[in-house]
Design a protein with these regions (language model features):
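Non-heme di-metal
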Residues: 1-180
């Protein structure tokens, strides 16, 4: 990732706090929108969502200043590292503290989320490996490929360059899975 020109400064801390605050506000407003919608306040729900979108853009602006966004390969590596920290250190530490303080159900939830974070790390590492081995759109074995835009199905070792149905590029193809 690119160097963070603010490293070690109070400005860096301010940017980190701004990013965290905007990110948390976005999530809160999304949750609030769901409540407003359930209670029959469609306009208020829409305004919470509109504001959440604004907060997302504010957070993105601060994250970019911190050099937190790179190319997909580096983003996958950073995401895997973050997920690794969450499942190996953060949630386990939180679970131990919760147990010590008598919150056993919460400790179990922390550990359960830690297991989910472990899966997230594995997913990101597998996707990173696909990029590194040039196997995102071409596999060594025959697969069923599906256009994520229109649903067109093709069987082969490689996704089509262009979908013949909707003309979307190869980037819209993924290995088709049915999990139902």
């Amino acid at each position: 990732m690119a160097a963070n020109k603010y490293t070690g400064t109070q400005t860096e801390k301010n940017l980190q706090e701004a990013f965290a605050g905007e990110s948390q506000a976005r999530n809160k407003y999304t949750y609030f929108a769901s409540v407003a919608k359930k209670e029959g306040y469609e306009q208020m729900s829409a305004l919470f969502l509109k504001t959440a979108d604004n907060e997302k853009e504010h957070a993105k602006m601060w994250f970019k200043e911190l050099a937190g966004i790179s190319n997909t390969k580096e983003n996958l590596a950073a995401a895997a590292e973050g997920e690794n920290y969450e499942w190996t250190d953060m949630y386990e530490s939180f679970a131990k503290t919760a147990e010590e303080e008598g919150f056993h159900e919460l400790a179990a939830k922390f550990r359960a989320v830690g297991e989910i974070e472990k899966h997230h790390e594995e997913r990101y590492r597998a996707l990173l490996k696909n990029i590194e081995t040039a196997q995102v759109f071409e596999k060594s074995e025959v697969n069923v490929w599906e256009c994520r835009n229109c649903g067109h199905i093709v069987v082969g070792t490689k996704a089509l360059e262009v979908c013949p149905v909707c003309n979307h590029p190869q980037s819209y193809f993924e290995v088709h899975e049915e999990n139902y």
